[in-house]
Curated annotation (Swiss-Prot):
PROSITE patterns according to UniProt: DNAJ_1 (PS00636), DNAJ_2 (PS50076), ZF_CR (PS51188)
Origin species: Dictyoglomus thermophilum (strain ATCC 35947 / DSM 3960 / H-6-12)
UniProt-annotated binding residues for Zn(2+) 2: C176, C179, C202, C205
Protein name: Chaperone protein DnaJ
Function text: Participates actively in the response to hyperosmotic and heat shock by preventing the aggregation of stress-denatured proteins and by disaggregating proteins, also in an autonomous, DnaK-independent fashion. Unfolded proteins bind initially to DnaJ; upon interaction with the DnaJ-bound protein, DnaK hydrolyzes its bound ATP, resulting in the formation of a stable complex. GrpE releases ADP from DnaK; ATP binding to DnaK triggers the release of the substrate protein, thus completing the reaction cycle.
A molecular function (GO) term: zinc ion binding
Description of its domains: The J domain is necessary and sufficient to stimulate DnaK ATPase activity. Zinc center 1 plays an important role in the autonomous, DnaK-independent chaperone activity of DnaJ. Zinc center 2 is essential for interaction with DnaK and for DnaJ activity.
Amino acid sequence: MPTKKDYYEILGVPRNATQDEIKQAYRRLVRQYHPDLNKDPSAHEKFKEINEAYEVLSDPQKRAQYDQFGHVGDFSGYGDFQGGWQPGGFDFGDLGRNFEDIFENFFGDSIFGDLFGRRREREKAPRKGADLRYDINITLEEAAFGSEKEIYVTRLETCPTCKGKGTEPGTNPVKCDMCNGTGQIRNMRQTPFGQFVQITTCPKCHGTGQIIINPCHECHGTGKVRRKRRVEFKIPAGVDEGYVIRLAGEGEPGENGGPNGDIYIHIHIIPHKIFKRDNEDIWMELPIDYLIALLGGEVEVPTLEGKEKIYIKPGTQTGEVITLKGKGIPYLRNKNQRGDQKIVVKITVPQNLSPKEKELLLEIAKLRGINIEKDKNIFEQIKKAFKGDN
């Protein structure tokens, strides 16, 4: 039968109360009327009303139904099976629902529970904690040679005050009076297939068999608190963009004795000002003076490990590639093997010449049979000569 009780009035909260306000009111009334704490004969009935109101108002779906219709239907959608098959509001569209949900609506965690995996037991089974993801930017040098890093992780941990019990120090949970500490509610159900025992998780203690009367002031009864921790880890030599490092057991704590989750570090490499990476090789452009290109000589080039001198052979052309063996990125799977550094030569021609330099270059041009057109800039012609244009 639909209830005529005003659940909001029972809990002493307004109709627009938040879930936190409803929970606080419930806990206050539980401490006041719990039969183990209040010996008044009327306390037991009042306590049942409080639990009934909280069961509805703490569930958003049930609360919405209560607010709309003034009651919460029992076994909605299948009619009332007391006394035989009553189709009532049966919606044939519901036939497409998952069979597990249909049978649990009929039988709860009854004999059919084993056929569908025993949902209640699955809920109590150890579960791994949630994994966490962090993204970190590193330099090309750190990617090449590896590095040690640290991050600060905010995660749930066991409450240090109550040691995970959820109760205020010096107090203990009390046995749930709704399920008598079993964590289960057993009801007889008359169905089209006969009479069955319906076993469901206790809505009051959520299957724990215990009720926290005095919640811990630090974790508010959850047994867990958020803490910021420093986590150190190593980046191996040779990693590339998108590489993922797994830190086992550093994620959120597990439930029901399950293992902690993991942290996954996603590596991103900051673009380098000089080098471009190509797998294990690195590439760079090296501007050199045109005289070095003509006559040859030593120049200083940057490498991942510092500056190094190399020799430019006479007559080197723009676009030539000089290879420094073993100066690239170490192979991730073989630290003793490295890629190469590829240097692309880019010859630079001066924009301004002194009169003496111009005179000498004109002499060289004559020796090489180059006709310097007087109406064209000598520097443009020199550039053309280096490019091979005539």
